[in-house]
């Protein structure tokens, strides 16, 4: 089976590929070799815009040899429409069915959603099977394209050993007098993420409260791109400004690599509250990381985030605060509510355990491949 993108850690966990010996990438441009996904082919933001995207799918030098099935998650957004058509035509000509998991109905990083919508529509209509993560997303896909997806809830991203290690290490990142540690996830600082304005809006959380700490979590390459050669000085300036004006006991910048979340897990586990400041979204893998590590998320009322987090449970009994992004004061109110009334994260729904998720995918693969 070929998987796009095969190297993405979330994808591998979602479909249970970590133990697989033969995982192939679906390269949507020439020159990608068998086995592992090169880093530059994982996300559209990391792709060379001058590269030729032919739509051909190669395994080593021989197209589609020994490939029975393709599973596409994401990573196709950078393609021109004719290249997406070429991918579909190439698969049809070779007689290789493909499964599509729709993580994002709206473009996850840019306001112009038309290219992503067109790409997704082309793939949805051609796929042998379509999967998504929530019932409300499945309904939206049916309304838009008349397809009836299989809903496979998001499984956990971390196993018990990883969770225990992160929690233990996270305790060493907090002092005995740190009653509140708030994280703000800026990800790649794309158009879908609120920036400095939101950091300013969080100032009331720390005012009049001793021992409130702020952690700004950002993807390392995005930070390097934003700050250029002055990235260290820029980071120190931002931290100093927020610490002085926001009243935080401390402010620290936490950078992570997109393909290696291991080092950032203790930082995440050390948080009491994590703000996910999306301007628009469909689902969020980071919500599932909060669930794994027992961190209370604060997120806006956009996309299907609320449905994903509170899937089939009572919001009043569990952690997680939803705020109105149109109200400048709402995010601080939500963070205060989350910190002053700590509750357990919602449990995962039936069918989200790793064994069931893997079994469900295996059944879908067999049906799509005609086996």
Residue ranges and their predicted role:
Residues 171-199, 203, 215-216:
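Conserved donor-binding/catalytic core segment of Leloir-type glycosyltransferases
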Residues 322, 326-329, 333-371:
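A charged, aromatic-enriched C-terminal amphipathic alpha-helix characteristic of glycosyltransferases
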Residues 125-168:
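Donor nucleotide-sugar binding/catalytic pocket of nucleotide-sugar-dependent glycosyltransferases
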Residues 38-126, 135:
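Extended catalytic core of nucleotide-activated donor transferases of GT-like folds
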Residues 31-32, 152-168, 188, 221-223, ...:
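Short beta-strand->alpha-helix junction loop in the catalytic core
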Residues 290, 296-306:
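Short hydrophobic beta-strand element within catalytic cores of glycosyltransferases
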Residues 228-266, 273:
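Nucleotide-activated donor-binding/catalytic signature segment of Leloir-type glycosyltransferases, i.e.
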